[in-house]
């Protein structure tokens, strides 16, 4: 009996040790997936394929990494709001072009699509601190442009992009007018137990019962729950209730954390929305929700205001 129990104990311990070793060695490959299986790192299409007016933008992050982006306008002199768009963790910005094409039509906006370092045509390798620098470089570029209304820059982020957007919005209260989060997680620490269930006993955020013994090994914790609590700008939360990747209660927790300090928070649920298709399954309600938010919190300047 003792031998059996000992074998069971050591067997379980071996599994945990092996799992932790894999986490330490390959965690970036779990969090950041620039290349989808069976596809190449390059863009399968460009905005030109969808007859969109765009610029190829090359930026340099503060640590010297060369970044690529697309700046897409509804028409050359569009002075509507500008959406700074942050994608999920997998694939590249070309895979979001169809959604962005509809976004431009429905919201009458410009869209700036950034390729994180290591994604698409951008150089370097993805990391949390690196991507935070990349996002700042994109915002600084937009803030310095003279062909857009820089008082109407709104950050949009889905999943990982929401974590990126939350940090950027928190750090730039004078440059970002509002934030839109869609199907975003509370933290990678909380997601570890979702992706690898045995890790929930060892890795977790402040709101979990995890022992948190291994939190220190996570190099990209992306604590959205902490960033959201410090944001003073308006925030729209878009939650797909059929999200198969990020449990929908993550969005509810983010909203509760934000709304406790920020009265300009709006939470909208989409009953049939999954992780990637909430914008599609939500139909006109989805776009109307976004449009109303922009009209309220990133409104067009009145002529008397611009004349002052």
From Swiss-Prot:
Q: Where does this protein chiefly localize?
A: membrane
Looking at the UniProt entry, the stretches that span the membrane are 6-26
Keyword Transmembrane on this protein?
yes
Example of a GO cellular component annotation carried by this entry: plasma membrane
Q: In which tissues is it expressed?
A: Expressed in roots, rosette leaves, stems and flowers.
| Compartments reported by the entry | Cell membrane
- Explain what the UniProt record notes about the effect of disrupting the gene for this protein: No visible phenotype under normal growth conditions, but mutant seedlings exhibit enhanced root wavy growth and curvature in response to gravitropism and phototropism.
Gene3D superfamilies found in the cross-reference section: alpha/beta hydrolase (3.40.50.1820)
Q: Where is the active site?
A: 159, 243, 308
Protein name as catalogued? Alpha/beta hydrolase domain-containing protein WAV2
According to its UniProt entry, this protein's organism is Arabidopsis thaliana
């Amino acid at each position: 009996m003792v031998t059996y129990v000992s074998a069971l104990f050591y067997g379980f311990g071996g599994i945990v040790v092996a799992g932790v070793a894999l986490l330490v060695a390959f965690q970036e490959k779990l969090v950041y997936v620039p290349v989808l299986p069976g596809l190449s790192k390059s863009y399968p299409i460009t905005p030109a394929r969808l007859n969109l007016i765009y610029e190829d933008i090359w930026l340099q992050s503060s640590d010297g990494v060369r970044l690529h982006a697309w700046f897409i306008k509804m028409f050359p002199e569009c002075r509507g709001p500008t959406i700074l768009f942050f994608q999920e963790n997998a694939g590249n910005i070309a895979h979001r072009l169809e959604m962005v094409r509809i976004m431009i039509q429905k919201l009458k906006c410009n869209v700036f699509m950034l390729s994180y370092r290591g994604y698409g045509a951008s150089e370097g390798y993805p990391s949390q601190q690196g991507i935070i620098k990349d996002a700042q470089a994109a915002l600084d570029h937009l803030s310095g442009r003279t062909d857009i209304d820089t008082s109407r820059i709104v950050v949009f982020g889905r999943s990982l992009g929401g974590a990126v957007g939350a940090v950027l919005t928190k750090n730039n209260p004078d440059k970002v007018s509002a934030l839109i989060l869609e199907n975003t997680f509370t933290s990678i620490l909380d997601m570890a137990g979702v992706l690898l269930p045995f890790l929930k006993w060892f890795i977790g955020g402040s709101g979990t019962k995890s022992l948190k013994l291994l939190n220190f090994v996570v190099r990209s914790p992306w604590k959205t729950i902490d960033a959201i609590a410090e944001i003073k700008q308006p925030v729209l939360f878009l939650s797909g209730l059929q999200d198969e990747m990020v449990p929908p209660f993550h969005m509810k927790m983010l909203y509760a954390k934000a709304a406790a300090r920020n009265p300009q928070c709006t939470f909208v649920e989409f009953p049939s929305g999954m992780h990637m298709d909430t914008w599609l399954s939500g139909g006109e309600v989805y776009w109307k929700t976004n449009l109303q938010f922009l009209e309220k919190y990133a409104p067009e300047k009145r002529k008397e205001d611009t004349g002052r």
